[in-house]
Amino acid sequence: MNPALHLGVALDGYGWHRQAWRATLAAQPATESVFSGRYWSGLAATAERGLLDFLTIDDTLTPQPGRRESISPRRLAGRGDAVLVAARIAPVTKHIGLIPVATVTHTEPFHISKAIATLDHVSHGRAGWQPRVSSTPHEAALFGRRDAFADGGELFDEAADAVEVVRRLWDSWEDDAIIRDAQTARYIDRAKLHYIDFHGKYFSVKGPSITPRPPQGQPVVAALAHAPRIYEFAATSADLVFITPIDDVSLDSILDQVKVAGGQHLKVYADLVVTFGGDTEFGSDALIFDGTPADVVDLLLGWQQRGVDGVRLRPAVNATDLPVIVDELVPLLQRAKRFRTSYRDGETLRQRLGLPVAPNRYTEVRP
């Protein structure tokens, strides 16, 4: 029997086309603002109706996608905080995984740790995190604390340290540290909170966290990777990697590079921008595919045969392309018995992705 395909969706603004805002307003003049909780809740409800593994929420330190300092008046400008958006939609969803982007370059790992741990608690074990680096001088100037790194490799060295700190902080409370025993007047077992005592080139963090250990123990860490150094970062720091093949040849090459980097344990999702009859003349780091839902299914299953675990679809225009994914593409996969027909109640995101239980590195072995 052929294995089921894993499928997620990547959300950014009104969609991944640079003029998605215009297409959205043309199709739905009364559509909500991207700063509205109702807008994001609606997208999440649609994605969950399609039984998708997870949704990711993009974020950067610039008001528009890309590395330019100047702001184009013709493109959507401004963005909310992805982690806060995920926390907003967690209570109105029940099953779908929530993976926001959070930039590590100018953000303390302590803050990221407690934010993602909180998201995992409020979503009952459905949280993940996609670290991102920031490399431009104008992004560094927003914070006024230091210059941008000249060496991109150093950015990922720092990012690896940041992820390690975050992971240690998630483990700094044992699972049963909270007692809540009114009779003995003990709320917490202090012996089950641990200093992490991390000392590295970029961070020195004592810990423990101020947030109890997340329900998953270790929320899922994902990385978007385009190059060998980032495949190495994913292999050492992540559970899940998003790759960007443009054809079968590049897919085979990337999968080989991920393995060479030590990423045999990673769940590999290929990114694909999809538009169903829309414009394809726009820039993207990932392949842009225009076709019918059946055409997309053929491509996805072909990629699965070549070795990916799943695909993360990026709708060119959320308002028009996401419903086609959910209402037309997913049923085709279901009829082919290649996609789930229901969620499992109480399933965490780690469980859905087939990741192992995350042991606590600080828990002593007790008789």
What are these regions (language model features)?
Residues 1-92, 216-219, 365-367:
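N-terminal beta1-alpha1-beta2 module of alpha/beta enzyme domains
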Residues 10-35, 105-195, 240, 249-250, ...:
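Flexible, glycine-rich active-site loops centered on histidine and acidic residues
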Residues 199-202, 209-263:
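Long hydrophobic segments that form regular secondary structure
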Residues 1-31, 95, 137-143, 192-224, ...:
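N-terminal small/glycine-rich loop or linker at the start of catalytic domains
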Residues 5-11, 55-57, 96-102, 125-131, ...:
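Hydrophobic faces of well-ordered beta-strands that scaffold small-molecule active sites
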Residues 32-47, 112, 223-236, 288-304:
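Short, acidic/polar
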Residues 141-147, 151, 162-168, 251-259, ...:
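C-terminal helical cap(s) of enzyme catalytic domains, especially alpha/beta-barrels
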Residues 7, 47, 51, 89, ...:
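Conserved, mostly hydrophobic/aromatic
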